[in-house]
Amino acid sequence: MKTVLGNISANEINAALCHEHICCYSEYLHMMSGRDYLDLPRLEEKAIAELKELKLKYGLNLFVDCTPVNIGRNIELLKSVSEKSGVHIVCSTGFYYTDEPVLYSSSAETLAEHMIKDSKNINAGIIKAAVEDETLNSFNAKLLTATAIAQKELNLPVAVHTNANNRNGLKALEVLLENGVSPQKITIGHLSDTENMEHILEIAKSGCYIGLDRMYDNKSEEYINKKVNAILRLCDKGLENKILLSHDESFFNGFEASPKLKDNTRFSYVFEYIRPRLPESVWGRIIRENPIEMLEV
């Protein structure tokens, strides 16, 4: 599998988080306001320290950074954090769903060419795609088509940001499948945002991965039990080998109303609150084996 510091083998992996971010930010605002907007050196120090701690306490040594190029992907930052923390980091090529002039004016084929070149330059291990609204418009379809073209050339897995409450994961999945992407190469993300198990199972029928990758910092018994029960129900349906756990967390989210470097993150949540309630065999499958199978190329 591919990381920012080079390729690694499966036997190097102990535990993986499959949908996270070191940071998401606007390069435009950073150019305009510098450290008043984002103090990158301070963020880097914090990320290194926290990843070191996660590795020491929980064995985490693979961190999939799903930040696409147009919301602040910073390869030099990822390389430095990986090298100094000892945690392997997988980076993404691909585009977020935001309608930007260059994305609007370029064809699917042209965007795919950019992704292919970018992936080879940065050793990307995953392609990020994204849909948000209930209805997929022609712009969304074009980005997904570009993703499919690039995927078939690169043979990389695709991670799709979706809005589970809009049920748009099915629509994104349909476009990718129609354009020749194998379901085994697709993760439909953020399905932990819905309690509609029928919707999740409908997506799972395709054979794609199920991203239960938005675990929030909610320590109530009700919330924890809902998340654990959803995992166990999927296991009962024979889907144990298709579940991916993560948080969709970042040290800095520059798109919030008042963005700031976070004092507390929730990267440890699944280790502290989900793991103790799962059989060890299920936990091992979800936190290690499934990520390896998803990422191997």
Task: Label every PLM stretch briefly.
Residues 121-195:
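Divalent metal-binding pocket/active-site signature
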Residues 19, 63, 151, 210, ...:
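Divalent metal-coordination and catalytic microenvironments
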Residues 80-83, 88-154, 208-209, 214-219:
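Active-site gating/metal-coordination segments in enzymes
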Residues 213, 239-260:
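Short acidic/histidine-rich active-site segments
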Residues 69-70, 188-194, 215-233:
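Active-site glycine- and acidic-residue-rich loops that bind
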